[in-house]
Amino acid sequence: MMFRSDRMWSCHWKWKPSPLLFLFALYIMCVPHSVWGCANCRVVLSNPSGTFTSPCYPNDYPNSQACMWTLRAPTGYIIQITFNDFDIEEAPNCIYDSLSLDNGESQTKFCGATAKGLSFNSSANEMHVSFSSDFSIQKKGFNASYIRVAVSLRNQKVILPQTSDAYQVSVAKSISIPELSAFTLCFEATKVGHEDSDWTAFSYSNASFTQLLSFGKAKSGYFLSISDSKCLLNNALPVKEKEDIFAESFEQLCLVWNNSLGSIGVNFKRNYETVPCDSTISKVIPGNGKLLLGSNQNEIVSLKGDIYNFRLWNFTMNAKILSNLSCNVKGNVVDWQNDFWNIPNLALKAESNLSCGSYLIPLPAAELASCADLGTLCQATVNSPSTTPPTVTTNMPVTNRIDKQRNDGIIYRISVVIQNILRHPEVKVQSKVAEWLNSTFQNWNYTVYVVNISFHLSAGEDKIKVKRSLEDEPRLVLWALLVYNATNNTNLEGKIIQQKLLKNNESLDEGLRLHTVNVRQLGHCLAMEEPKGYYWPSIQPSEYVLPCPDKPGFSASRICFYNATNPLVTYWGPVDISNCLKEANEVANQILNLTADGQNLTSANITNIVEQVKRIVNKEENIDITLGSTLMNIFSNILSSSDSDLLESSSEALKTIDELAFKIDLNSTSHVNITTRNLALSVSSLLPGTNAISNFSIGLPSNNESYFQMDFESGQVDPLASVILPPNLLENLSPEDSVLVRRAQFTFFNKTGLFQDVGPQRKTLVSYVMACSIGNITIQNLKDPVQIKIKHTRTQEVHHPICAFWDLNKNKSFGGWNTSGCVAHRDSDASETVCLCNHFTHFGVLMDLPRSASQLDARNTKVLTFISYIGCGISAIFSAATLLTYVAFEKLRRDYPSKILMNLSTALLFLNLLFLLDGWITSFNVDGLCIAVAVLLHFFLLATFTWMGLEAIHMYIALVKVFNTYIRRYILKFCIIGWGLPALVVSVVLASRNNNEVYGKESYGKEKGDEFCWIQDPVIFYVTCAGYFGVMFFLNIAMFIVVMVQICGRNGKRSNRTLREEVLRNLRSVVSLTFLLGMTWGFAFFAWGPLNIPFMYLFSIFNSLQGLFIFIFHCAMKENVQKQWRQHLCCGRFRLADNSDWSKTATNIIKKSSDNLGKSLSSSSIGSNSTYLTSKSKSSSTTYFKRNSHTDNVSYEHSFNKSGSLRQCFHGQVLVKTGPC
């Protein structure tokens, strides 16, 4: 008993804890291993280099892991990752445990040991590594290292070669240095050591190694050498005697020169000075030389140091622009980008603290020019007043940023004290703190961004040095401005920002420790009016831009400052209303600088620039040649931009250029010529009643004095464009117009980016563009046309060129090409086109390859139009006759072929009627009516194609698949396909696109009246018309061949016909089927190239007469149709009695022979000479057939028996029992 009790007791304790053990085991399996002490495996890695491993490495990784490592680098870098160790559970397709690598372009999965020792690069500046494990089998995992690799030159400096035979750092061969009469040159440099020796930082020389431009240091001091003139710069450099301008940290130096001033501008350490150098007046630096960094002479060494961000412009910048020059202003001659340089790898060194490097998220691109002067064209940099302590400022990126800083944002001043334990250089401390601030506020719940970060100096310090504590511990005081955009009205207290920074203290770089943090919100400047008429609202410290009250398009500005020692104290700075007082010439010159070569203008920039120029033009009553030249150069620079960027502002730009030409001052001269690189303008005075100007031409100059040469007299030998005005140009002008006619304006466009047709039918512009206008009036419908001769942009054969003018009102005022009133003259050739136009505007030559109807000459167009209208009229009449015949006589429409023929005739009838009415309806200029006609024409064209295809399908069923074929509701299904399919296609087109883009007026000739309501979109045309017909056409060809094989096979068995009779019968069958199945529409496929015109004639003749041929072969020549006509329409001896032999023959279903089948095979093809027989006998009944009048002929018929099976019967000399036929 005791034993039992013990056993029972023992068993009791054995099973009692089992539920707990089960839960514990489940917990072990399900809880991620990081709970037991392994590191977190969902992190973002943004350090320049480092390592990461699988959880618990080098021990086995836990079960059920889902890890993600996001590796990020700044713009301009990629990430390279290397797997030093790799051991993950192996399985097919890595279905259990796996590591997935996403490089930005593709995703790759690894398992087993496949990735060990391999390296992978990201496609951009971010890479994702994910790792997952299942519930069983653990392995060692992986160990990976990563590093940033610089791919942008902005992140790399150049180590200058110290010997001429070491290597050369030069501008790439693809970059051509232009001839320079002025330049601005900026670069940053460092110098190693304190040797007082001569050196050269850069040199520019010709092919014979003659120095053309160089900068360096000689015994006499720092110099800039231009050609053979050496200009000393010591007086402009704020350095002591024998002190190097460059030290161990980078300093930027900018040099400015203009050959008309005789002085050198030097901008160094935010100080701009000029030094005289009269020997450089009128000198020009030749182009196509070789630019090197360092020295190209053996006797002079290169600067012993590094160079960075070397940029060169072929124009001058003033002190204000240079003081605000940002990293994103690209040099238009040479820029610090890989494409501009040929640099050996050993000369490059990547660093993360370069001034224009992208070690953080980059700021928006700054604009070149004074923002206060240019209004909305760019955003000014906020400058601190002179009363504030000096700062060293670093631009900071935006964290969770929006596109522009908002004035309603809340601004905080963050003051941090950093302990510099390892005594890092101040530049490095600044960089590390910047990274730390960026990472701290990245992906925060509040939308904030840091404006800048700076070292703060207390009063009395003359250098940027550290503050030292009592323990002589080096500390740095840094200030940063943080902007909070309270988009959701959520309050952000300063202590929350402070706690966020303190919490992230550990992420600071080694050797740096956060000592204290202080966050204070900045105050507001009060609203006020100063001076009168200028109202400044209450804002936080920032710049506020106010439109000039009496000068639309220009603006005044004022800055709200905060007190450095007490951020709650704010005050307004002085009002800058200089822009409101500027003359148009000064503003135009500033805009010209903004558009100078090399500037990367966006579409928004161009739109703003055009708007500014438009305001200048509208304001000025008379524009002198100086201002006009500046404005034309602005437009010329704009034309160098991409076509996509020009599209939005093209219409306004063209209107402004026209207005500019009209306002050019001619009081002191009879004509004005302005030439630029991409644009030329010529304006000449003109008196009514005279022929002072009979022609104008523009061509390339005989020398290099200007871009183009313009001539109003004899013309040039081979001009790019010329205009010949008719002698009666100014006749019959009204008195009002005569007053306005005082000038003629001609504008030539070398670049055609402003002429982009966004309409659905986009033709290709193959010539330059020439604009002509007389005063400010509209002249059209000239008795004698204006002759415009325009060169093609490329010498090539342009088949059927189209002369067109630019219609500013087309395409919802975006503009588009219009051919009305212009035709191409026969004197045109491969290199140029001669256009004759009856009005004035912007003229160009287009090429429209696929649809060439509008490219025919006037004679062929008239002939083809005449043939089409006459043919369609005849076709409509006889299609109506065919349809009326079958509708009127009930006996004719009992069989299926007759019903199919009726539907085909209906589609043809409406197609021809709509075609005849289309041109007349177009003349009403009612868009809705034109679209409706085009839609109906499209529908009935597709319906015609469809019913021709159904004819072919029916013949195949009747002649080839003759046994055991039964289709319920045969005609109903054909009607659904015949009318429903075209309706579906047209409905889809109408639903998927704007009706105005698909259907509308289309020009199909060169005369003004050659317009047609039809499909405008070429894609819709080729898919729904050409493609649709192509399918039906090839189907009909296949059916045509099959049917003809059947006919010829049966007719070939007859022995009582001569060869001539056999050929004629087969030929008649071919002709009747050709028109019935629409085979003549296939001529369209051959209307290309030299055979274009002949096949267009064949196409027009046969297809416009299709209704006539169908009437002849499938109505008039049918015996049962003739019988009905004679019975009901004829009188006297021509009338046929109802009980005639002919009638009996047909009524008793005595069929003609297969040659008669061929004779009238058709839509009424099968059994066409009699009605179809629907047998009333049972399937077991016997049917006998009567002998035909031709005893040797075999008659052929199809009929449907009661059960619905299609039957085939033969009639011969002997009565044959065929069964249930």
From Swiss-Prot:
Residues recorded as bearing Phosphoserine in the entry: S1165, S1168
PROSITE patterns noted in UniProt: CUB (PS01180), G_PROTEIN_RECEP_F2_2 (PS00650), G_PROTEIN_RECEP_F2_4 (PS50261), GAIN_B (PS50221), PTX_2 (PS51828)
Keywords: Calcium, Cell membrane, Cleavage on pair of basic residues, Disease variant, Disulfide bond, G-protein coupled receptor, Glycoprotein, Membrane, Metal-binding, Phosphoprotein, Receptor, Signal, Transducer, Transmembrane, Transmembrane helix
Segments on the Cytoplasmic face: 884-903, 951-970, 1046-1069, 1114-1221
Effect of F1012A: Impaired conformational change in response to 17alpha-hydroxyprogesterone (17OHP) without affecting response to progesterone
Effect of C822S: No cleavage and not detected at the cell surface
Effect upon mutating K1001A: Impaired conformational change in response to 17alpha-hydroxyprogesterone (17OHP) without affecting response to progesterone
Annotated effect of mutating W1081A: Strongly decreased G-protein coupled receptor activity in response to 17alpha-hydroxyprogesterone (17OHP)
Presence of keyword Membrane: yes
Name this protein carries in UniProt: Adhesion G-protein coupled receptor G6
Gene name per UniProt: ADGRG6
